[in-house]
């Protein structure tokens, strides 16, 4: 044996003694499983070479956990999907009807079709009543005739208790008022000849 080999053997022997002092297990370099991570032995296990003092392995682990090969374990994310969280909050706060009503307002063209949506406008929703204004009196009349079908489509899409009634209005009559001040007049006159 040369001097270098003897020095290496002495250093390895010191490492083995220190390892035995700390946790009692010394890896066997000839064994393939020597580099696998093992679970720490309890402090003070005298039967397997522990010293019973405070030199054992602390059971608390710090940092990121690793697998048997020493690589970091992937983080396990157990977060709920965002949709599930939102649905739970909407139900718990009682917003289901309000959100359904908002959906009716924003998807009006999808509910009644593009042609009708072009000539109508949803003004507001109040107490299960949908207020709609139309471009002309003819469109208001047609929409009143289609009221039952529109309510059925709304009930299919958002639920039966969201909208119960449609209030359909024609266009606003022209106002002859000009300026901020007004004196009550004698009513409309025959101004069209």
Curated annotation (Swiss-Prot):
InterPro entries: DciA-like, UPF0232_actinobac. Coiled coil: none annotated. Pfam families: DciA. Residues 47-56 have a biased composition (Gly residues). Residues 17-74 are annotated as: Disordered. It comes from the Bacteria. Transmembrane segments: none annotated. HAMAP family: UPF0232 (MF_00630). Belongs to the UPF0232 family. This is UPF0232 protein CE0005. It comes from Corynebacterium efficiens (strain DSM 44549 / YS-314 / AJ 12310 / JCM 11189 / NBRC 100395). The lineage of its organism: Bacteria, Bacillati, Actinomycetota, Actinomycetes, Mycobacteriales.
């Amino acid at each position: 044996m040369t001097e270098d080999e003897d020095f290496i053997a002495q250093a390895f022997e010191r490492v083995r003694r220190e390892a035995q002092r700390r946790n009692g297990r010394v890896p066997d370099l000839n064994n393939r499983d020597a580099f696998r991570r093992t679970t720490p032995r309890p402090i003070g296990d005298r039967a397997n070479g522990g010293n019973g003092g405070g030199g054992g392995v602390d059971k608390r682990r710090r940092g990121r956990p690793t697998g048997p090969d020493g690589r970091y374990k992937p983080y396990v994310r157990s977060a709920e999907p965002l949709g599930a969280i939102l649905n739970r909050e909407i139900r718990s706060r009682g917003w289901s009807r309000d959100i359904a009503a908002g959906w009716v307002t924003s998807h009006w063209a999808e509910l009644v079709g593009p042609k009708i949506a072009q000539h109508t406008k949803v003004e507001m929703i109040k107490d299960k009543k949908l207020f709609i204004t139309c471009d002309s009196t003819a469109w208001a009349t047609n929409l009143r005739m289609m009221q039952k079908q529109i309510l059925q489509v709304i009930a299919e899409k958002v639920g039966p208790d969201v909208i119960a009634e449609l209030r359909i209005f024609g266009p606003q009559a022209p106002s002859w008022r000009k300026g901020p001040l007004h004196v009550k007049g004698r009513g409309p006159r025959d101004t069209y000849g």
